Structure formats: C-alpha cells, structure tokens
Swiss-Prot record:
Upper classification of the organism: Bacteria, Bacillati, Bacillota, Bacilli, Bacillales
Record's keyword terms, sorted: 4Fe-4S, Amino-acid biosynthesis, Cysteine biosynthesis, Heme, Iron, Iron-sulfur, Metal-binding, NADP, Oxidoreductase
Organism encoding this protein: Brevibacillus brevis (strain 47 / JCM 6285 / NBRC 100599)
Pfam families linked to this entry: NIR_SIR, NIR_SIR_ferr
Keyword Ribosomal protein: no
Protein name as annotated: Sulfite reductase [NADPH] hemoprotein beta-component
Entry-linked SUPFAM superfamilies: Nitrite and sulphite reductase 4Fe-4S domain-like, Nitrite/Sulfite reductase N-terminal domain-like
Record's cofactor remark: Binds 1 siroheme per subunit. Binds 1 [4Fe-4S] cluster per subunit.
Family from the record: Belongs to the nitrite and sulfite reductase 4Fe-4S domain family.
Gene Ontology MF, one: heme binding
Gene Ontology terms: cellular component: sulfite reductase complex (NADPH)
Gene responsible for this protein: cysI
Amino acid sequence: MSENHLLSSNSAPHSDVEDIKRKSDYLRGSLAETLEDRISGSIPEDDNRLMKFHGSYMQDDRDLRNERSKQKLEPAYQFMVRVRAAGGVVTPEQWLMMDDIAQQFANGTIRLTTRQSFQLHGVIKWNMKQVIQEVNEALLSTLAACGDVNRNVMCNPNPYESEVHQEVYEWAKKISNHLDPRTRAYHEIWLDEEKVVDSRDEVEQEPIYGPVYLPRKFKIGIAVPPANDVDVFSQDLGFIAIHEEGRLLGFNVAVGGGMGMTHGDPKTYPQVARVIGFVTPEQVLEVAEKTVMIQRDYGDRAVRKHARFKYTIDDRGIEWFIHELEQRLGWELEQVRPYHFEHNGDRYGWVKGSDDNWHFTLFIQNGRVKDEDNYLLKSGLREIAKVHTGDFRLTPNQNLLIGNVTSEKKPEIEQIIQAYGLTDGATYSALRRNSMACVSLPTCGLAMAEAERYLPTLLDEIELILDEAGLRDEEIVIRMTGCPNGCARPALAEISFIGKAVGKYNMYLGGGFSGNRLNKLYRENIGEAEILNELRPILNRYAKEREEGEHFGDFVIRAGYVKEVRSGLDFHE
C-alpha cells in the first residue's frame, strides 16, 4: 500500500467524511445500535454516511415537510434501498421477490435506475433489516450499491451477438465480484453473522480499498459496439468490447469520465472518458483493480466535490495516469483498436439473438414500475415473471428487457404483453423513447426542481412542436435531472435540463447522439414557457436545414447555437 494512501486516513488534509470512514471499523460504526432505536425514524449523520456503503440513503418525503413542521413532527423519514445486479440481469424468481418486497415494505413501486439497479423507495427504518435480508434471500445484494466504492458494474443488455454479450456479461460479473468490499460488517449488521475478532491487518481486511475506501464513488461500464447504451464515456472506467465474427478479442480502456458538477462552481464539470489502450479479456481484472487503487491513492480526500477520478486525471494529466497504471501492471497497454458507436438508446420491441432466443424491450417511462388506473405495468410484469423461463435485464436507459424467450414461449409472453397493453413505445415520439429523468422530488434530498414527475408533461408540449415540424419520428436524446449531480447523465444528451430552482432549469444543447460528446449551456434558469419558446425555432430550423443523417446535437453546433465541447475542461467556457 502506498505512502500516499496511508497518509490519506490520518495526517494528510481530509474531509470529515474521511474521519467517519476511518473510525467506522470497516463500515460498522454504530449502525447496529442505531437500527434498534425506535424513538426516531432517522439515523445520526455519521451512520447515514456509512449506510450508503450498505446500499441505502436516508430521505424524507419533501411534499410533507411543511405540513409535518406545522404539526411539530419530525420529517417523514424513509430510506431508499438500492439493489445491485451486475449488468442488470435477474431471474424471473428474483423479479417476483423484488415485486413482493416493494409491495410489502416500500411504496409499492420499483424504480429501475440508469445504472441497471433496482431502487425501492419509502422503506421505514424498522423494516430496513428485513428488507435487506429478503434481498439477500433473493441472491441479490445492496452492498456497495452506494458509497465511496465501485458501484454496480454496467453492461450492454440487448445483444446483437448473443455469444459475445454473454462473454462480456460474465466479465461484468467478475469485475463486480473482484471489487466488492471484503468487510464482514454488512453480514454482521444485516444478516446476523456472528462477529469475531479480526486479527488481520488492514491490507488483508480490505486489500483493494483499505480502511478509508475511495475518496468518492467509482463507476465502471462495459459497452458492446455499435451500442453505447451504457454511456461508456460517462464512466470512471469504461471497457469497450472489441469483437469480430462472434468472437470477443478484448477491450479498449477508457478512463476519467463523470457527470456531476456544482452550479456556480466552474472548477467542477462533467467530463468524457478518454480511450487510452487495448487489453485482452484476461487482463481486465488487473486493469480494473490497479485503476481503482490509483484513485484510492491519489484522489482528493480534502474536497469531496473535487474527489472524483476525472479530477485526479485532469489535475495530473492523462499521460501521468497511463505511466502510473503501466508501472503498477508491469506491462504496457496495446494500441487502441478501431470501434464505432451508432447510438446510446435501447432497441425496443422484439429482437432475435444469434442463438435464436428472443428479447423484448419494454419502454418504461423514467424507469418507474407501478400500476396506474389505465396501465397495469407492475401486474403485467408479475404475470410474465410467473411463466417466463429466461431472464429480465434492466437497461441503462431505465427500460426493461424480457430476455432469452424461446420460440416456444414467445406466444405466451406476447399474449400477456397484449392483455396488459404493455408498450414498446412504438406509438410514442422518438424523443420520448430517448428520454430519461432522475427520481428527484419528492424523495431526493439534493433535488432543486422536479424531474421524473415533470418530464412527461414537458414532453407532451415539446411533442406538439415536433408534430408541427414533422419530427415526431426523429431520434433525439433528451434528459432531465433535478440537480447537477448527473444521475440521468444529462451532460451527454442532445437536449438536457438540469434543475436550478423550483420550476427553473438550465438548458443545454449539443451532446453527441451516441454519447460521445458533452453538451453546452444554452440558456440559464428558465421555466416551461421559455423552454418551449427557445426550442420551437431551433426544432423548426433543424427540420428544414438539417443535412442527410445529421443528428440534432450535431446540427445545433453547426448552426451556431452552441460551441462544440471537446473536453469537460471547456464545458464552462
């Protein structure tokens, strides 16, 4: 372990969060005792910081804050529980168990995330232990779904080449398992494992992370060209599968992406990962491990908003990182192999894999699986899960793929889809099919404006403009978040809105259609009327003046609405 890393937990400048981690005894803290407390629905701040590593955030229902305050009641505290599934793949049995948990202990809905995870909202403190135990009984886990560790490893879920996809998915699982925290705290606190005195030194207890873990979260994704649905350039560490004739040759390695920033602070910015070389499949785990350890040793532990891997690389330079990585590996990366991305969206409807199995991708608006009066989505999926013999795959765009349907089972699945009116989005605009929003209000404590609850309404209005312009079937990527943390990867969208205040958004234009370019601020702090007034002339002009095959994000740059952003370092210029 490097000298830098040893200093990071003690004498070097560090934030209060670093002290909490260092004193936590490998993520134990006082969580076990806190969960027994029935006086309050909340937990102390130190334990709340540690709870993230265990897969949960404390939240409250912000819609009820004022009313509860008037009644002199504490906020309506609740917990969001995030469930990891590498590559987003789960069995029908696991889907049914998640459905049961959501119905019994959460708010009755399942939220599919932009990192191919499940989120359960509205879990109260005294049900937390049972929820996490039941998640583990389903052979899933919440460990490291949040916190300063490697998060859920993403992987392209919709195969063009089934054999290649399966191989890539296996590597996603291996990376995830390899980078899991080794502490037994999770098993002791949630799964009633008996605590024993651990005489191992810190290197043995957490060989990759050490006692203070990483400076901030770390995200890994694997893309399978021509699809960039995982938004590989948004990842701290991305692997781009290189394959030909159904055979996986290896991966190009991309480093230093990230979406989060802080309003009003130009020292923070989104960034795209840079492709630095090629590795064989057998070298992937070592590259992932060494990259994480470099961030562990050199990431900023004093200022958390400057602690992501993108800043470590930008501060020191990409050549420094390549040299440091190759020194630790003891070998050099190979030259980057050619690759090509065509889009970062999902392929809806039925797709036949090269193994003759079928895959059906449902459009799920903003990832919220629930039953409504006129659309029983959750019930329909439950019926499918009862008879399905393949798998379910959560997509990076918050949709759901019913995977590996045999030709024999396909008619039965189709019948349920039709009976419940489950949609692949074919009747919606292409803009809506390429839309994403984060959860935001009322549960996210960071939200400055609406996102999930508002974007569908805004899209209704934008679709009227699309109809005027004849663009209803034009693929345009649009995203909305309630704050600048970037959960829906808004900085890569052709059109994006980032919440600034209630009903007000910063509007960005010019992201790359395939997720390869950042967008640029176009208008600041505007509401719905201004948004529509700004978009109408641009969309109409695009309809009339676009070149053949020209995407909207490319057009707004060519037409001079915004400048092209080649690097996050230029994002605020």
